[in-house]
UniProtKB/Swiss-Prot annotation:
The gene is fba. Pathway: Carbohydrate degradation; glycolysis; D-glyceraldehyde 3-phosphate and glycerone phosphate from D-glucose: step 4/4. Catalyzes the aldol condensation of dihydroxyacetone phosphate (DHAP or glycerone-phosphate) with glyceraldehyde 3-phosphate (G3P) to form fructose 1,6-bisphosphate (FBP) in gluconeogenesis and the reverse reaction in glycolysis. One of its GO terms (cellular component) is plasma membrane. This is Fructose-bisphosphate aldolase. It comes from Mycobacterium tuberculosis (strain ATCC 25618 / H37Rv).
């Protein structure tokens, strides 16, 4: 299918929330990882989200360019072409963008999509993330208001983060402590600043103990009840029934989470879960195995010439793609979106 239109993307998220499932958002950095993600979605019979971080986008532009916008556009255009050959919907998103990179990443990408929409087309991306977790909440939400207006004009959904996700991603490290839980006051301020969709649709990455990186199951102290509290605060603020779920939540830092915690988060309105660390390992593991198994073929040892068919990058990248695709299928199963593509 062609990349999801704004209307299809909104329907994807709406169905997920209504039926208590979520979509994996797979961080990609190359054509190989994009191929792996889309194949995984298709194998699972699920729609899905592909996203590029600032570092991933820069990597995607190559060592000679090293430009985030160039890489994001190139990877997005590639995804548009490949996704059209598959029978599921794929949406494009950009991951964490801090304040110091807004002018060199999200704002230029918003401008590109706005230009496309002004000519009667669809945006290049379906959503962008503004990560204001490093600045005071009032400044975070003031910037979010400005970006939400620009995003809505370009038919794009904005993702924001309130609270801090622990661990490390793209070289940005955050401590793991009691600050990793979004407060009721911050949920209320979010509703006051951004509303409940009337100023533009947004996704909320609230923090409930999330940690980026690699952790053994059980070592991440998640409190999904924080999300339930957030929904209750928002419902009360908006005068809605107590069981209403005004927020569309995003689950960051899911590696090492227990399945029971994921299940609970889904009940409280999570519609998108970021997956990066686990798919990175799934991609790299068969490459490592290939190198160990064929070390005397991939290396020119003791004056020998090696074996071309095993140092041909295709020989191990195919294995990497297949392994990562399998991990994407697992993510779809864990989030209960498998078999639920809107195309079915």
């Amino acid at each position: 299918m062609p990349i999801a239109t704004p209307e299809v993307y909104a329907e994807m998220l709406g169905q997920a929330k209504q039926n208590s499932y979520a979509f994996p958002a797979i961080n990609c950095t190359s054509s190989e990882t994009v191929n792996a993600a889309i194949k995984g979605f298709a194998d699972a019979g699920s729609d899905g989200i592909i996203q590029f971080s600032t570092g991933g986008a820069e990597f995607g532009s190559g060592l000679g360019v090293k430009d985030m916008v160039t890489g994001a556009v190139a990877l997005a255009e590639f995804t548009h072409v490949i996704a059209a050959k598959y029978p599921v919907n794929v949406a494009l998103h950009t991951d964490h963008c801090p304040k110091d990179k807004l002018d060199s990443y999200v704002r230029p990408l918003l401008a590109i999509s706005a230009q496309r929409v002004s000519k009667g087309g669809n945006p290049l991306f379906q959503s962008h993330m503004w990560d204001g977790s490093a600045v005071p909440i009032d400044e975070n939400l003031a910037i979010a208001q400005e970006l939400l207006k620009a995003a809505a004009a370009a038919k794009i959904i904005l993702e924001i983060e309130i609270g801090v996700v622990g661990g490390e991603e793209d070289g940005v490290a955050n401590e793991i402590n009691e600050k990793l839980y979004t407060s009721p006051e911050d949920f209320e301020k979010t509703i006051e600043a951004l509303g409940a969709g009337e100023h533009g649709k947004y996704l909320l990455a609230a923090t409930f103990g999330n940690v980026h990186g690699v952790y053994k199951p059980g070592n991440v102290k998640l409190r999904p009840d924080i999300l339930a509290q957030g929904q209750q605060v928002a419902a009360a603020k908006l005068g809605l029934p107590a069981d209403a779920k005004p927020f569309d939540f995003v689950f960051h830092g899911g590696s090492g989470s227990l399945k029971s915690e994921i299940e609970e988060a889904l009940r409280y309105g999570v519609v998108k879960m970021n997956v990066d660390t686990d798919t990175q390992y799934a991609f790299t593991r068969p490459i490592a195995g290939h190198m160990f198994t064929n070390y005397d073929g991939v290396l020119k040892v003791d004056g020998e010439v090696g074996v071309k068919k095993v140092y041909d990058p295709r020989s191990y990248l195919k294995k990497a793609e297949a392994s990562m695709s399998q991990r994407v299928v697992q993510a779809c199963n864990d989030l209960h979106c498998a078999g639920k593509s809107l195309t079915h």
